[in-house]
Curated annotation (Swiss-Prot):
Oxidoreductase is among the record's keywords: no
Similarity annotation: Belongs to the phosphoglycerate kinase family.
EC number: 2.7.2.3
Subcellular location: Cytoplasm
Organism for this UniProt entry: Sulfolobus acidocaldarius (strain ATCC 33909 / DSM 639 / JCM 8929 / NBRC 15157 / NCIMB 11770)
Pathway: Carbohydrate degradation; glycolysis; pyruvate from D-glyceraldehyde 3-phosphate: step 2/5
Catalysed conversion reaction: (2R)-3-phosphoglycerate + ATP = (2R)-3-phospho-glyceroyl phosphate + ADP
GO biological process: gluconeogenesis; glycolytic process
Cysteine disulfide partners in this protein: none
Name recorded for this polypeptide: Phosphoglycerate kinase
Amino acids binding ATP: 336, 362-365
Primary residence: cytoplasm
UniProt subunit comment: Monomer.
Length: 415
């Protein structure tokens, strides 16, 4: 069992999954080359191989369901290539079935031998899969009524889709014994540390350009008194600097205005006035009109902000090294330009080398850690959550976790 907030989530170890027929919901949704239709990244596909191997080890037969893209989009393609890649990573043949609930798919599922694995076609070919509704409603959907009688258990390994409330994600737990897969378990276990008050001090390093999303996270952290310090970078830091009454110079104010962020200043000021432990950079790396880069104090900026400065790096790093939990979401600077990656790289390195447990929101951030640094997987978690991670940090309920908890309540008789 995993406990997160007030939810109890069963894991595959809590179900007697031995020689059973298991429906496994995974999330292999991957970026696709528009010209060739080929997958550009298979990291999500590879991640799920662990859960499949564990279920096969116990003699279970597995039917995989997942989605890829949305109808009408360039990345809305078949799951055939996904099944081939999964076969490679699992080390066993995974048969692709070009059907979902038709007679062909039903026959294949019924005839599946122990330790056999098949993958059904893109679940979003079914129009009802695009409907967002409560688990109780989806439990009565055609998909669930058609497939659930064919299985002994349902396992959901799709944390990256946990913010969706669609039939294949939340409908089955009300009609089948259900549990979280290993990918889901790792994600939820890691994130549960964020709201565990014993794991303190907690440092949140929040940057990037998604300012409105980040403000929601900060508001939730303030409400629940979770963060000991919130270290800001990127446009988030610029917004809080303005909210503090600091003049960032005409160019930087223009950037904030062009992005429509000045309207958020009163909201940011309210957070500062609440006494929230929000830190802003004391210096920045800026780009001048002649493309020269300089380090300038926050109180006297001439150039355009591109990264946090050395003094800020040292200050932020000292906070990070004293923490028990570090959550990093969003870069400190314009990382698309090699010249402005230093702040993000330095803080990532401090976190990974420090004593605390590290949660990195967004796999792209991990690529900036120096390759010479040994990453201890027991203390560093790279979340694949995306939208689910954002909503979790912002205090929103995740329908997939709610449905798995509901399954546990129904089957255990507890609440």
């Amino acid at each position: 069992m995993i406990k997160v907030s007030d939810l109890v989530i069963p894991t595959i170890n809590d179900l007697e999954l031995q020689n059973k027929k298991v429906l496994l919901r995974i999330d292999v949704n991957s970026p696709v080359d528009k010209n060739t239709g080929k997958l550009l990244d298979d990291s999500r596909i590879k991640a799920h191989s662990i859960t499949i191997k564990e279920l096969l080890k116990k003699g279970n037969s597995i039917v995989l369901i997942s989605h890829q893209g949305r109808p009408g989009d360039d990345d809305f393609i078949s799951l055939k290539e996904h099944s081939l890649l999964l076969s490679k990573y699992v080390g066993t043949e995974i048969e692709f079935v070009e059907d979902i609930i038709g007679p062909y798919a039903v026959e294949k599922i019924k005839k599946l031998d122990n330790k056999g694995v098949i993958m059904l076609e893109n679940i979003r070919l079914m129009s009802e899969e695009l409907i967002e509704a409560p688990p109780q409603q989806h439990a009565k959907s055609f998909l669930i009524k058609k497939l659930s009688p064919l299985f002994d258990a349902y396992v959901n390994d799709s944390f990256s889709a946990a913010h969706r409330s669609q039939p294949s994600l939340v409908g089955f737990p009300l009609v089948l014994p259900s549990a979280a897969g290993i990918v889901m378990e790792k994600e939820v276990s890691a994130l549960s540390k964020i709201f565990n008050y014993e794991d303190s001090p907690k440092i949140f390093v929040l940057g990037g350009g998604k300012v409105n999303d980040t403000l929601k996270i900060i508001e939730n952290l303030i409400k629940n008194r979770v963060a000991d310090r919130i270290l800001t970078g990127g446009l988030v830091a610029e917004l809080f600097a303005v909210a503090k009454g600091i003049n960032l110079g005409k160019k930087n104010m223009q950037v904030l205005e062009n992005k429509g962020l000045l309207s958020l200043v009163p909201r940011a000021r309210k957070m500062l006035l609440s006494g929230a432990p929000i830190e802003i950079p004391v210096d920045f790396v800026t780009e001048q009109e002649n493309s020269q880069t300089l380090e300038e104090p926050t109180s006297n900026l001439k150039g355009t902000i591109k990264d946090i400065g050395n003094t800020t790096i040292e200050m932020y790093s000292s906070f990070i090294k004293e923490s028990k939990v570090v959550v990093l979401r969003g870069p400190m600077g314009v990382i698309e330009d090699e010249r402005f990656r230093r702040g993000s790289k330095a803080l990532l390195t401090s976190a990974v080398e420090g004593p605390g447990y590290v949660i990195i929101g967004g796999g792209h951030m991990i690529s900036m850690i120096d390759k010479n640094i040994q990453i201890n997987e027991n203390k560093v978690h790279v979340s694949t959550g995306g939208g689910a991670l954002l909503l979790f940090l912002a205090g929103e309920k995740l329908p997939v976790l709610e449905s798995l908890h509901l399954s546990w309540v129904v089957r255990s008789g507890k609440s």
